[in-house]
Each structure stands twice: as C-alpha cells, then as structure tokens.
A protein has these predicted regions:
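Extended, Lys/Arg-enriched charged tracts that mediate electrostatic binding to polyanionic substrates
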Residues: 165-187, 191, 294-296, 301-304, ...
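Structured, charged N-terminal subsegments at the starts of enzyme catalytic cores
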Residues: 181-212, 221-222
C-alpha cells in the first residue's frame, strides 16, 4: 500500500478483585503497587508524544479498587509497612515481609540498587531466623519495597523520592508515610488522567466485563468443548447468559460514571469470545470488540503465514476490521508483534526491539494491496505486567516506540473508534470461533480437575442464589457483588496447572469466600466443599513450601 498503515495499540489494564468480601480489606497489594508503577505513568508518558494516539482498557473492578485506595483504603502490606516504624512487628509479620517485600524483578530492579540488594543478601543469610534482623532493617526493607514499585520517572521527578533513593537507608516514620502517600495519590490520579486524555482525543478507553469473567463460560460452560471436545466441564453445566450480559451492562454504566462517555469498544476478558458472547456485546450496545488472530483463523479457516522475520506474508487477511452477522465489528491482534512486546523485547535494547517491530510492520505494509483497504494493524497486550521484564520499567522501549511511530510517515497510530468511523468494515465474518487469546481455546479457565471443582461450587452457589432471590438483577447488592466477583476469570486462571504463584492459596481462599458469603446472607450453612481448598493437593503442598524471600530464579508470579 502507498498510504499510511493504521496502527491500533491497546494496552490492557487489569488486576483481580482483591477486596475480601467478609472484611472489606484488600488482602494483596498489587493494585496499589501497579498504580505506582504503571497506571498513572503509562498515561502520563503520552504527554511527551502529542501526535501518538493509544487505546487503553481499564477494567471497571480495577477502577473501583483505585478509587477505594484514593479514599484511604489499606491493604495488609500497607499496614505492615506502617507498623515497621513503630517497632511492633510480630514474628509472623517479619516472616511475611521477608516473603513478600522482595517481590519485584530481581535483575531489573533489586540488582540496580545496592542497598536493596544488600537487604536481600541479609535476608538470605538469616533464612528462617528473622529475629537476627534489626527493627531498622525492616523499616528500610518496607520503604525500599514500596519505593521500588514506583516508576523510575516519577522518582526522578520528585525531589523527596529521589533523595530517599539516593540516601538508601536509615529511613524515618516521615519517609515511610511520604512514600505511601505518594502511592495513594497515584491511585487517585490515574483514572482522572485517562479521562482527560480521552476528552482531548488522545486516547480511547475500552471497557471489559465488570469483574473480568470469561463470557463464553458464563453463558454456557459447555462451550469449552467447542475448541477442545475432551475438556472436563461441570455437571450440571454453568448456564447463565443473562449474567454475562449484566456484567457487560454494568461495565457500561460504570464507564459512563467514571469517564463521562459510553464505551464503544470492549476487550472481552482474555479476548475470549463466542457467537453468544458477540450477541451479548451487541445487546449491551457496544460497537466493536477485539480478540486474537488465532480466533480469526479458526473462524474463517485461515492460516497466517509469516516470513523469516515474523512478518505476515498476506497481511490483508488479518489487518482489517470484520463485520459479524449481528452488525458488531471485530478486530484481531497481530499475535507475533503483541507477544514480542509482552514476552521478548525486554531482553533486547530499545533500539533493536523497536527496529524489529517496525521491520515487521514495514514488511506487512509493503505487501498490502494498494486498494484503499481499510487496513489496520492491531497490537494488543497487557499494559502493566510486561514492563517488569524491561530495564527502567519499559520507559526506554516505550519512548523509542512512540517516537519512532510519530516520526515515520508510513504509519499512523489511531484510536480504534475513530478509524472505524472513517473506515467501516467491508468484510463479513459469518462464523465466530469460541476461544481466547491463548491458543484460541478456553483451557486455561476450564478443563482440569481443579477447574471442574471450582465451576461445580460456583454453579451450586449460583443456583442457590437464583432459588433465593431470582435473577442476578433482582439480587440484593450484598449478594450480587460477590457472585459477580466469583464469576471472574482470575480464580480459574490460578486453578490451571499452567499457572502458579506464591499467592495460589490466597486466590483460592478469595474465590471460596465470595461464594460463602452468599450462603451466609441467606442464613444458610455453606456446603462443605467451600470449606476446604479447591487446589490440587500437590499445588497446596508446593505453595506451602514457598516461604522466605523470593529468590532469584524462582517463578515471579506476583501481581
């Protein structure tokens, strides 16, 4: 093609819902920490590139948690951090700090700060005997952990944070309070900055089903067998299509409340779609959705051939919008480029990484017919976790990427809805495969024994709630919310044998707790199966053995 190739970058912002339904306290700190490291900074970085346009998702349940922190909510790690300056830590809290407060990339963060590295070495030397470490040690560790989770640019731009980084030790109560206060400010500021950027035409904000459920599985859990006929599915099946629609409708309501406009696009949780999910998107009055190229391949019986550098040989098969039979528009991400950013480019220099990305786009553009298209390359991935694998929190890569795209006349970054307004889809997609961004199936969330146990107790709890109160829409909020939370994808992600973290037991407990409160609200005793872990026995033993500091080389499955 001779004109500019439109490039749609979509950064997905999501964390599980960490608020415990029985205590209303946050049991894990990752929303607060990612607000300090990613959410605010990813939006603020665009101020340096006024011609670059980007798309973001912000899951409604994530924005709820950010607002809670802005109003003064705490998590366990905040409270432990504050207690270090009182010198009143219990032995259990000291153990907890040694297990949690090195949970950040060792090579790209801890190793870059001599004092933080020294604290890790002392922790290793004192393994199993935290009483060997002084009260001052834990004050310094608390501040370093929280400081290290703040974006390096924000530290450099704040005189006091920069002074704390350079001083490196002997921190005070005032120092600790200042760092936590800055994190709270960042959580407060992030949604407002996104709203401002969208109002100025710089970004488009997509939505996601409210508590991040896998729509096809909420609609009918048997749909997992469409991509994998041998998948284990719960018996009786989980079949609540109106729950899926309600998760979408409430996401739209939340989006209007938070950002002042109705969302036009949606990234279905994990890019998981099905014909029925597309119909729910239509009913929620959302114009378009995005998923993965492999879903398109299975839908249209296409194979996306790539050359030696990973560029598409026939990019016109992927780089365009598609019109479904119900009128909804679909885009599908370039998996090669998206996954390179997410999993590979962090090990390369920014110059080489961006050069590789542009090389792929350039080759694809040169192969596109000069027929007016419309052609659009979609790059879609996690907008927070990827940067932990990059030096300097990915800032050097992002600046190089945005600067290169802004200067290269062959490409134009776009807000997706702007592009679709100017270039409606010309190609029909009569069939839509049921699958997600991972292998075009739903195996990560359904199909294993632990999955089956979790879906079974969720179905039993959902059926009980239906008998007590009727549909999800008719339930009292104190029942409806934990049920919607329990329908979220994250619990099932961690029940998969593919995924593990030091927090596996916490995720299991949160899932069961959200189910339990529904029974209690009705004055009923929860079933026995909710009173014991749903994880496989081997996983429980493995997680129980992961104590002490997170060591270099161990799986870094945090946040």
């Amino acid at each position: 093609m001779k004109g500019k190739l439109a490039v749609a970058i979509i950064w997905h912002m999501h964390q599980p819902y960490y608020k415990h339904p029985q205590t209303s306290e946050f049991v894990l700190p990752w929303v607060r920490l990612h607000a300090s490291k990613d959410y605010l900074h990813m939006a603020r970085l665009l101020n340096e590139f006024p011609t670059v346009k980007v798309n973001f998702t912000m899951v409604p349940s994530l924005r709820d948690q950010l607002e809670d922190y802005a109003r003064g909510a705490d998590d366990e790690d905040t409270r432990v951090t504050m207690r270090t300056v009182e010198g009143t830590l219990t032995p259990e809290e000291r153990d907890h700090m040694l297990a949690r407060f090195f949970s950040i990339h060792h090579g790209n963060v801890i190793a870059q700060h001599d004092e933080y590295r020294r604290l890790l070495q002392l922790a290793l030397a004192a393994r199993g005997r935290p009483e060997l470490l002084s009260d001052d040690y834990f004050v310094d560790l608390a501040l370093w952990f929280n400081l290290a989770w703040i974006d390096p640019d924000d530290i450099a731009g704040d005189d006091r944070l920069r002074d704390l980084r350079d001083r490196a030790r002997r921190f005070t109560r005032e120092d600790v309070h200042y760092v936590i206060g800055r994190q709270r400010f960042m959580a407060s500021g992030a949604p407002h900055l996104y709203r401002s950027l969208e109002r100025d035409g710089r970004v488009e904000i997509l939505t996601t089903p409210y508590y991040h459920p896998i729509l096809p599985l909420i609609i009918d859990s048997r749909s997992a067998r469409r991509a994998d006929p041998s998948a284990l599915v719960p018996d009786p099946p989980f079949v609540y299509p109106d729950d899926a629609l309600y998760q979408l409708e409430e996401a739209v309501v939340s989006h209007v409340r938070g950002f002042g406009v109705k969302p036009r696009g949606v990234w279905p949780s994990e890019g998981a779609v099905s014909p029925e999910a597309a119909d729910a998107i239509k009913k929620a009055h959302i114009d378009w959705f995005a998923s993965d190229e492999a879903v398109l391949g299975r839908s249209a019986d296409l194979v996306f051939e790539r050359d030696d550098i990973g560029a598409l040989v026939h990019p016109q098969l992927l780089y365009q919008p598609f019109r479904l039979t119900n009128g909804v528009t679909a885009l599908f991400r370039d998996r090669e480029i998206s996954d390179r950013i997410g999993f590979s480019y962090g090990a390369m220099s920014p110059h080489d990484a961006v050069g590789d990305l542009i090389w792929k786009l350039e080759a694809a553009r040169d192969r596109l017919p000069d027929d007016g298209g419309p052609y659009i390359a979609s790059i879609i991935l996690d907008g927070e976790n990827a940067w932990e694998a990059y030096p300097n929190n990915g800032n050097d890569f992002l600046r190089t990427l945005y600067g290169t795209l802004a200067a290269d006349e062959r490409f134009e970054t776009v807000r997706v809805s702007d592009f679709l307004d100017a270039h409606p889809p010309l190609v029909d997609l009569p069939n839509l495969h049921t699958g997600s961004w991972i292998d075009a199936d739903l195996k990560v969330w359904s199909g294993e024994p632990a999955h089956e146990r979790a879906w079974h107790v969720l179905e039993r709890t959902r059926r009980f709630a239906q008998e007590q109160w009727g549909s999800l829409r008719e339930m009292p909020p104190s029942v409806r919310q934990p049920l919607m939370v329990a329908e979220g994808s994250d619990w099932f992600w961690w029940y998969s044998s593919r995924n593990s973290s030091p927090e596996d037991r916490v995720f299991d407990e949160l899932f069961r707790a959200n189910c339990e409160v529904i029974w209690w609200y009705a004055g009923a005793e929860p079933p026995d199966e909710l009173k014991q872990p749903l994880l496989d026995a081997g996983r429980i033993a493995a997680v129980a053995g992961e104590s002490g500091a997170m060591l270099p080389g161990k799986r870094e499955g945090y946040g």
